[in-house]
């Protein structure tokens, strides 16, 4: 199946519908790469600076006034993800997970998140190979981002959490290994960039729209058949 090439700001509902219904895997247009790499560079500069930049070289929330040593940045971002893996309930369908991952790609493609290109590459490879993080259905109200669901998604990328691959549930690191992939190490701000977003809520909204379209189309067909009969 031909992959979708995503151009942030120009992604269509038709493209996202293909992701939902037909399991189309997507990747960013390579034109996005320079902006992504430049934002990654700027974040690294900020992380090494003495000037406090929230979530880059400081703590989060009430700990925003705490300066973080550059050597502790990796642990800070990893702990941010693991501490938010607190979702409950049954896991959401892979069709929704795939939409979430695709929407996160689109967000990163704008070059304003501060993530590095290797993050984008792994997300694209997971979509291509069908590595689907196990994400609990409950745990977000979408207020300051879908923190818990997106943390569960990100956990697999750092070799934690759980993921489905070829119909089997694996530990995150094992799922990546089975697919021939390797986990990433989160750099400054990258954990924050992953969980600050509404891709979980948006994916469900899109799924509702696509299902409604499908139901409407079927109702037209059945009405026509009934009239003809």
Language model features with spans:
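Conserved, well-structured ligand/cofactor-binding cores
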Residues: 1-229
């Amino acid at each position: 199946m031909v992959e979708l090439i995503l151009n942030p700001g120009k992604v269509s509902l038709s493209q996202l519908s293909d992701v939902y219904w037909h399991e189309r895997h997507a990747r960013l247009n390579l034109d996005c790469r320079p902006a992504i790499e430049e934002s990654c560079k700027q974040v690294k500069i900020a992380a090494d600076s003495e000037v406090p930049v929230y979530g880059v070289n400081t703590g989060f929330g009430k700990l925003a006034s705490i300066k973080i040593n550059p050597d502790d940045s990796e642990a800070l971002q990893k702990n941010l993800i693991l501490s938010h893996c607190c979702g409950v309930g049954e896991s959401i369908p892979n069709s929704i997970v795939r939409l979430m991952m695709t929407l996160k790609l689109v967000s990163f493609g704008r070059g304003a998140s501060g993530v590095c290109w290797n993050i984008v590459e792994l997300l694209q490879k997971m979509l291509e190979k069908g590595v689907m993080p196990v994400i609990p259905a409950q745990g977000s109200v979408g207020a300051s981002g879908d923190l818990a669901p997106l943390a569960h998604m990100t956990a697999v990328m750092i070799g934690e959490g759980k993921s489905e691959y070829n119909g089997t549930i694996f530990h995150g690191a094992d799922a990546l290994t089975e697919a021939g992939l390797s986990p990433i190490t989160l750099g400054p701000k990258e954990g924050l960039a992953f969980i600050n977003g509404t891709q979980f809520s948006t994916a469900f909204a899109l799924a509702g729209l696509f299902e409604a379209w499908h139901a409407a189309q079927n109702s037209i067909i059945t009405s026509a058949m009934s009239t003809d009969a």
